[in-house]
């Protein structure tokens, strides 16, 4: 059996999409990490069973010296709280870990990059996570291989147990009047998502631990920074008809969103060029907000109209109806938390 190449744990979350998962596993096999945590949600119905079985066959193809842990659920928990459950599980056994979902295809050097960052910044409380995805693809004018940002993507990331231990799965911060006022002011000052607090209220009402809002809240309250590679290291395969967060296909996404699913991924060269200071790259934050349309209502409106046109063009009337219903429900529920 071949020896491992990089001494770093990796958590892989998957469900019933063997085609996407096989691309992720192929890159993991090329990197050969020392430890794997495999998490699979359970079936919603018998129709999921063939895909679930096929995914397990993919993950059985581990042909190097690797410590493997598996958590295969018997029942279906859904994307949330499966994300939270799997991450707490992995970080309960290791102090640092890389996290990949079944549609996050990393460059091979991403694993060594994360290993070096996890070791270098392990004791630095300013650093919350290491991202693999760069929304700009290549951030111009940066003379280093990575920089620091207050905004980040969770499409392939790594962090430490010290960070995950700060997570508040019960959203108790919503009951803290003073610190909620501070959070509201911080969100306004940073021009962060206006619906973030609404999302937190909605998630606690659903009685589920949604790790994205839990993670972002922890990062905001603790003034955390993310490490972002200067050149993108992740491809996301999530814009498909069976994806969790997107409906239809990449062809019906507005052009501004489509590019983030079609951009290149790059390999980083070692030794890394390290930044001289730990300071936020504000220009990157502004660029990401513009790309995602956060704080740019006219960009949002334009993309909504573009998406409507594309779905009409492709005859996706059920998606249009669902989107309208979701938008109305969102407006109505948001009013309850004002």
Task: Report residues per predicted region.
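Peripheral/terminal regions associated with large enzymatic or DNA-binding modules
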Residues: 1-99, 104-338
């Amino acid at each position: 059996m071949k020896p491992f190449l990089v001494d770093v744990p990796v958590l892989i979350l998957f469900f019933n999409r063997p085609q996407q998962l096989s691309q992720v596993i192929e890159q993991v096999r090329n990197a050969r990490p020392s430890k794997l945590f495999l998490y699979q949600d359970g079936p919603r119905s018998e129709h999921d069973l063939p895909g679930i079985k096929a995914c397990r066959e993919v993950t059985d193809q581990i042909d190097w010296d690797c410590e493997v842990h598996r958590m295969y659920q018997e029942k279906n928990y859904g994307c949330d709280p499966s994300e939270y459950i799997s991450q707490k599980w992995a970080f309960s056994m290791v102090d640092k870990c890389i996290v990949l979902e079944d549609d996050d295809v990393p460059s091979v050097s991403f694993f060594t990059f994360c290993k070096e960052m996890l070791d270098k910044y392990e004791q630095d409380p300013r650093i919350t996570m290491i991202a693999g995805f760069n929304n700009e693809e290549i951030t111009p004018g940066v003379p280093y291989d990575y920089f620091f940002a207050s905004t980040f993507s969770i499409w392939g990331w790594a962090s430490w147990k010290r960070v995950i231990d700060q997570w508040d799965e019960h959203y108790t911060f919503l009951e803290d009047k003073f610190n909620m006022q501070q959070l509201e002011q911080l969100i306004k000052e940073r021009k962060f998502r206006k619906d973030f607090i609404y999302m937190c209220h909605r998630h606690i009402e659903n009685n589920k631990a949604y790790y994205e809002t839990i993670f972002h809240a922890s990062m905001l309250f603790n003034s955390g920074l993310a490490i972002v590679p200067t050149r993108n290291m992740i491809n996301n395969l999530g814009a498909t008809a069976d994806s969790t967060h997107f409906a239809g296909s990449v062809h019906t996404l507005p052009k501004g969103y489509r590019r983030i699913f079609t951009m290149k991924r790059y390999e980083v060269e070692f030794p890394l060029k390290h930044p001289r200071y730990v300071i936020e790259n504000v220009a990157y934050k502004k660029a990401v907000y513009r790309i995602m349309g956060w704080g740019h209502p006219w960009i949002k409106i334009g993309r909504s109209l573009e998406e409507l046109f594309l779905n009409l063009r492709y005859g996706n009337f059920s998606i249009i109806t669902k989107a309208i219903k979701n938008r109305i429900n969102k407006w109505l529920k948001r009013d309850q938390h004002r």
